[in-house]
Design a protein with these regions (language model features):
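N-terminal Rossmann NAD(P)H-binding glycine-rich loop of SDR-like oxidoreductase domains
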Residues: 2-22
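SDR active-site strand-loop-helix element
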Residues: 6, 45, 79-85, 134-136
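NAD(P)H-binding glycine-rich loop region in Rossmannoid oxidoreductase-like domains
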Residues: 28-61
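Conserved Rossmann-fold NAD(P)-dependent oxidoreductase catalytic core, especially the SDR/UDP-sugar
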Residues: 66-103
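Flexible, glycine-rich beta-alpha linker
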Residues: 88-89, 125-149
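Active-site Tyr-X1-5-Lys
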Residues: 105-132
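Alpha-helical substrate-binding/gating segment
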Residues: 139-141, 152-176, 182
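Conserved C-terminal active-site "lid" loop/helix of NAD(P)H-dependent oxidoreductases
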Residues: 175-215
Length: 215
């Protein structure tokens, strides 16, 4: 598959480019309709860079909107947005799932991530291409969790999650998944992505379909 990854977070884009196998991958700031139309899948790295002032916040959100608009015009098949689990500000003893309401902190970077998701969800309701939101636990490091972080993802788990989302054809046009490395004090459930095959459009259902008698 031909995959375009948005530039802007060098660490994440390098991890994906160097570890996603079996695909043709390009990292680029050129998010014009003409360029996006050359790809099957677009991976947006949300607004994970630091946001320093309100003007930068506005530019980031406008950039997300423009990128999604170009995706619509280019008839791309799938868009994956890499977001962050940091937009949940619940107590440590809570176990959070994909259905929980986001509670962003009053801080520009956190707000920019949350607003990016809001725009993505609106496009998810309106346009027919497949849109997948992957909230990731940070920090992202290539080592096992030492149980000091309740929200942590090693690189292997992150890459495997993105690879699954690229390869699968989901039943629904919009889905949200959480990914973090499992630990004794994990704050976020990852059952949904662990059992992602159950959401495949290729999976035959087991409901009874009455046979219609031809007249």
């Amino acid at each position: 598959m031909n995959i375009l990854i948005t530039a802007g977070n060098e660490n994440l884009s390098n991890i994906l480019k160097n570890n996603l196998k079996g695909h043709s991958i390009k990292v680029s700031n050129d998010l014009s309709t003409k360029n996006i139309s050359n790809f099957d899948c677009l991976i947006i790295l949300s607004s994970l860079k630091k946001c320093l002032d309100p003007e930068e916040l506005n530019l980031k959100i406008q950039g997300i909107y423009n990128t999604l608009s170009s995706s619509v015009e280019s008839n791309i098949k799938k868009v994956i947005m890499i977001s962050s689990l940091e937009i949940f500000d619940y107590k440590e003893n809570y176990t959070v799932t994909e259905t929980w309401k986001t509670t962003p902190k009053i801080e520009l970077t956190n707000l920019s991530i949350n607003l990016s998701e809001v725009i993505f969800k609106e496009f998810g309701r309106t346009f027919p291409f497949q849109k997948i939101l992957l909230r990731t636990g940070f920090p992202l490091k290539n080592k096992f969790n030492d149980n000091k972080n309740s929200c942590f993802t090693n690189e292997t788990d992150f890459v495997n999650a993105v690879s699954k989302l690229i390869d699968i054809n989901l039943k629904n046009q919009f889905e949200i998944f959480h990914i973090q490395t499992k630990s004794d004090n994990a704050k976020y459930l990852t059952n949904k992505i662990d059992e992602i095959d159950n959401l495949s459009a290729d999976l035959k259902d087991h409901f009874y379909h009455p046979r219609v008698q031809e007249l």
